[in-house]
Structure formats: C-alpha cells, structure tokens
Amino acid sequence: QILTGLFLAMHYTSDTMTAFSSVTHICRDVNYGWLIRYLHANGASMFFICLFLHVGRGLYYGSYMYLETWNIGVLLLFAVMATAFMGYVLPWGQMSFWGATVITNLLSAIPYIGSDLVEWIWGGFSVDKATLTRFFAFHFILPFIIAALAGVHLLFLHETGSNNPSGLSSDADKIPFHPYYTIKDILGVLLLILVLTSLVLFSPDLLGDPDNYTPANPLNTPPHIKPEWYFLFAYAILRSIPNKLGGVLALVLSILILAVVPFLHTSKQRSMMFRPFSQCLFWILVADLLTLTWIGGQPVEHPFIIIGQLASILYFLLILVIMPITSLFENNLLKW
C-alpha cells in the first residue's frame, strides 16, 4: 500500500481544480498508472478483509487477553480507518466530496465545541481546497505511523508469545520461524495476491462507487451517500439512531467496544474452541455484522430502517450481555 501510494503521489495533485484530472491522468497516461491506482484502491479492501479476519480470530480464540497487544490493535484499527477515509476523499469525485462532508459534519454533534471543531478541520466554511490539501498530507503521514504502531504491536506480542487455538501455553511446542512458518505463510500470501490481482485485473470497480467517476460538485448531492463497503456496518449503526449525537456515539462505540471485550471475559477457558454455545453466538455476531454491512448500503426506507435498528441492538447486546452470560453458563455446564 505504501509503495503504490508513493508512486500515485508522484503524479497526484492535491488541488480541487486538478485532483480529479490528475487521477484520470494517472489512469490514462502514466505507464501502468491504472494498475498502480487499482492495486492501491483494491489493496485497501484486501487490507480491511485481513483486519476483520484478524480481529475475528482474536475474539474467537481469546487473544484479547494480551491487553497491551489488543489495545494497540484497537488503536491501529482506528488509524487505518481514518487513513482509508481520507484516502477516499483524494480523487475528489462526488462520493469523495459528499463522504467528506457527511463524516466531518458528525463532529458538529460534539456539544459546545462541535461547530468550531468542524470548521477548524475543514479550514473554512465547507469542504474545500484546504480540506483536500490537509487530507492528502494526513493520508501520506498516517501509514508510517501505522507501520510504527504495528512494530509496537509485535513488540508487545513478543513479550508473551502468540496465542493458539486451544488457548493453552504453546511453550513446549515452539519451532523455528524459518523454514516452518515462512513456508506456511507463503500459502496465505499467494491466496491474498490471487484475490487482489483477480479484483484489479477483472473487475477493478466492483467495490467502488460509480458516483466517484463524476467530479465533485458542491451544488449537486448524490441520491445515496454511502462509504466504501468496509465502513458500511458502522454507517448502518450510525444511521439506526435518529439522533445526531447518539448516532455518533454509537458509531465510535461500535469499534471502541473491542477495548471492553477483555473485561467481559467470564469463561474459565480462554479460547472458544471447546465452547459450542459461545461459538454459536460468535457466528451470530458475524452474521449480524454482515447484515449491518448490507443495510449500510441500502436507502433509508421501510424494511431497512427496522432491520438496521434490530441488527444494531443485537450487535451491542451480544457483546455486552449475551456472550458473557453464556460463558458463565458454560462454566456451570462443566461443573466449574
């Protein structure tokens, strides 16, 4: 991502007048510019698929018991989401502009300082030149901060060693990283590259929004403003609350709730490997998140509103109430 981003930055201009044209120029005139652009855009999607799988794996096997590692991971998730959001603004298409307008506007829900804060971030009274320029600057710097944080993430992981599916100590079974893990990892890397190249070379716009091929126009709002697919679940939670501040809080908490998970671990076992009821609830949570992702991309109309609200309630209920109680129930089943 950093490499493709670097090559894109060589040809991109962060001015409202030329940003859209510069992206078009990259795709049409720069040698393999189209490839670099689509690798970067779809690489972000693959990045998020990996992150979601990584977080899901951590939840399933109780890896969140490594508190420092887990909390830095949550911080990393926020940083990557911020980076992806700002990157989406850079091509300066309709969805770029209106996405930036809608999401930055959410900060105005903060009491007292809200409206001042929004204008400070915009660098004016609307999303404009100043906003685009600073978003480009931040989008360039953040990945390096993320890379550094990922180093710290690993540093703390190495204090304890990694977890395994059984949730038991694996000290007795440790083997050299090379050649064993290096060979094993090649499979995953090849699979990742296969999916990414298939996306980029066969349907590069599959995950994008056609509205972003229309240059940004402050006078014309697109009929359906929605973020990239990897934000849709959070967007659905935001929209399911008919109050601005409430929605913003729910949006932030939908991710921040991950930091609370270690303190809600009531089971006497670490992993879900031998806990069928918790497993069942975990997959219900996954299905719920997929439902939210689907709802986030739908218009705000009758079946979708209520489905989104129910899915949002279920999301918080599962994590905060149902799963901890089920863990206690499983403890009793084993006469512990």
UniProtKB/Swiss-Prot annotation:
Anything else known: Heme 1 (or BL or b562) is low-potential and absorbs at about 562 nm, and heme 2 (or BH or b566) is high-potential and absorbs at about 566 nm.
Any one GO BP annotation for this protein: mitochondrial electron transport, ubiquinol to cytochrome c
Residue stretches spanning the membrane: 1-10, 34-55, 70-90, 135-155, 183-203, 245-265, 277-297, 304-324
Residues that, per the record, bind heme b b566: 54, 153
Gene: MT-CYB
Pfam families to which the protein is assigned, alphabetical: Cytochrom_B_C (PF00032), Cytochrome_B (PF00033)
Coiled coil start-end: none
Free-text remark on how the cofactor is bound: Binds 2 heme b groups non-covalently.
Domain of life of the source: Eukaryota
Binding site for a ubiquinone: 158
Description of how the protein assembles with itself and partners: The cytochrome bc1 complex contains 11 subunits: 3 respiratory subunits (MT-CYB, CYC1 and UQCRFS1), 2 core proteins (UQCRC1 and UQCRC2) and 6 low-molecular weight proteins (UQCRH/QCR6, UQCRB/QCR7, UQCRQ/QCR8, UQCR10/QCR9, UQCR11/QCR10 and a cleavage product of UQCRFS1). This cytochrome bc1 complex then forms a dimer.
Entry GO CC: mitochondrial inner membrane; respiratory chain complex III
Name of this protein: Cytochrome b
Matching InterPro entries: Cyt_b/b6_C, Cyt_b/b6_C_sf, Cyt_b/b6_N, Cytb/b6-like_sf, Cytochrome_b, Cytochrome_b_C_euk/bac, Cytochrome_b_N_euk/bac, Di-haem_cyt_TM
Location(s), subcellular: Mitochondrion inner membrane
Entry GO MF terms: metal ion binding; ubiquinol-cytochrome-c reductase activity
PANTHER family named in the record: CYTOCHROME B
Required cofactor names: heme b
